[in-house]
């Protein structure tokens, strides 16, 4: 109780079971800035992978991954700005909140695309290249039908989609980068604690954003280091 009273201005009460948490003004600002500052680095990083691509398939993969990465931060930032400054536009806010949830599914699929597209995989793993996008489409349909109704189910879908391709990727003969992949996944999982702690921990959602940013950076590093050329090769080809 003393903790809540001390940080009352930085945190509101928990959301109802089928409702959405209402952040304080401080939390709104933190939610916006923690992802807004990552938009430009995401764009630059995506462009770098595209420039380092050797062939058409690598370029397509870099484009898919880059679009997912940039979309995550852009859509999240726009939603939090609308939620903060234009909350009276209920329909607009609701639409952007749905987009914010949907883009997570496509970001997960895009994050695995480089590993599934650019590494030699077995027959089962090759099917995962397409199945993961079917899961993303299924998640999108779920958001349309049951947005904010079954929060635990939604979280289960995110975690299932995050772990299912990992089981296939770990079966690759070339295991370079798997430690970084696992490390990033662990960071995402730890961040989920804060994702579900609005109204319990001040700035919980903004802290979740920082976990997402850190995990995404670890995964980007692994993709850049093990699936695309090194900076030395890049400079040599300029």
From Swiss-Prot:
Cellular component GO terms held in the UniProt record: Golgi apparatus; late endosome membrane; lysosomal membrane
Keyword terms, alphabetized: Endosome, Lysosome, Membrane, Receptor, Transmembrane, Transmembrane helix
Cytoplasmic domain ranges by topology: 1-28, 83-101, 145-151, 196-198
Parts of the chain that traverse the membrane: 29-49, 62-82, 102-122, 124-144, 152-172, 175-195, 199-219
Residue intervals annotated with topology Lumenal: 50-61, 123, 173-174, 220-238
Domain of life: Eukaryota
GO terms, molecular function: pore-forming activity; protein kinase activity
Major subcellular site: membrane
Compartments it resides in: Late endosome membrane; Lysosome membrane
Recorded topology in the membrane: Multi-pass membrane protein
GO process terms (BP): positive regulation of neuron differentiation; regulation of protein localization
UniProt-listed NCBIfam families: hlyIII
Protein name listed in UniProt: Monocyte to macrophage differentiation factor
Native source species: Rattus norvegicus
Protein encoded by which gene: Mmd
